[in-house]
């Protein structure tokens, strides 16, 4: 079983940015797991301008914005798996996933980031135990 310092579930903008930032801060062994056929998440469907002003100081379409983050991940040599569904994350951070190439497989993580974007489920639907578990933040926390 492969071991990673960080496993990120979701290859959209949040997952890609988290991976690049983690690499820049000294995390060497990173795996992004994405269920779709390409990285970029929902941005690939957002053809209007308006992305990137804060991060890249220019106005970009969703696909252009996603491409910048994808390039950041590729430039840093961060590993990723596409068309891969996470089936389980155990309390000891063992991630069980599956895809056509590898079948069912497990990786051990030292840390896990759930960056599942607009498809994110509530904490209860994710079966994360406890009322207010430490270190668990959902996209809804910003609102």
Predicted segments with their positions:
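Beta1-alpha1 glycine-rich phosphate/pyrophosphate-binding loop at the start
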Residues: 4-64
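FAD-binding core/adjacent interface of flavoenzyme oxidoreductases
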Residues: 1-9, 67-143
